[in-house]
A protein has these predicted regions:
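Short amphipathic alpha-helices in soluble, non-transmembrane regions
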Residues: 85-93
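Short, conserved charged micro-motifs
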Residues: 76-86
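Extracellular and organelle-lumenal recognition/adhesion modules and their flexible linkers in secreted
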Residues: 96
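Generic structural motif
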Residues: 33, 49-51, 72-76, 140-144
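Short, charged interaction patches at domain edges and termini
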Residues: 1-12, 51-64, 104-146
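Active-site-adjacent structural patch at catalytic or cofactor/ligand-binding sites
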Residues: 63-75
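Small/polar-rich, solvent-exposed N-terminal microdomains that initiate assembly or binding
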Residues: 1-59, 99-108
Length: 146
């Protein structure tokens, strides 16, 4: 049975994204107070869903969990999307996920057939409006017995 620490999954995703997609990476929710960099450069929020245990009786711990990366792109004048930041974040997220689907080894990896995306407009608790790009995928947890 998978007895996996959720924070380890957050750490796995954080380490993939920090400095590659953005320096502003948060777990679980939009922070209540945003930094100047958050409001000018944007930020991303990582969410980890429910872990589904798919272990078998052969001593292998195996599971899956749906995860979401939400990129918050600040608006420019008159509420328009900042195409440069949006494209940079979208491309960086897509590249990170693509690399992980090709790796397909280690304790965690991203399953290729489970990738979804969407976009929306959201407001932060500080009443800042953002365009959001959301990427959803399955992280596979593969722990071999020792």
């Amino acid at each position: 049975m998978v007895n996996e620490s959720r924070i380890d999954i957050y750490d796995y995703l954080y380490n993939l994204l920090f400095g590659v997609v953005s320096e502003n990476v948060y777990d679980m929710r939009v922070p209540q107070e945003l930094t100047e960099s958050d409001t000018t450069d944007g930020f991303i929020v990582i969410n980890v869903g429910s872990i589904v245990d798919e272990s078998e009786f052969v001593g292998e711990a195996f599971g899956r969990v749906r995860c979401f990366i939400e990129a918050f792109v600040p608006q420019i004048s008159r509420g328009r999307v900042n195409h440069d930041i949006y494209a940079a974040m979208e491309n960086s997220i897509n590249n990170v996920i693509k690399e992980q689907t090709e790796t397909n080894e280690g304790t965690y990896y991203i399953e290729q057939d489970s990738i979804l995306s969407m976009d929306d407009v959201e407001e932060s608790s500080s009443d800042n409006s953002y365009f959001t790009f959301v990427k959803s995928f399955i992280v596979v947890i593969d722990k071999q017995s020792e």
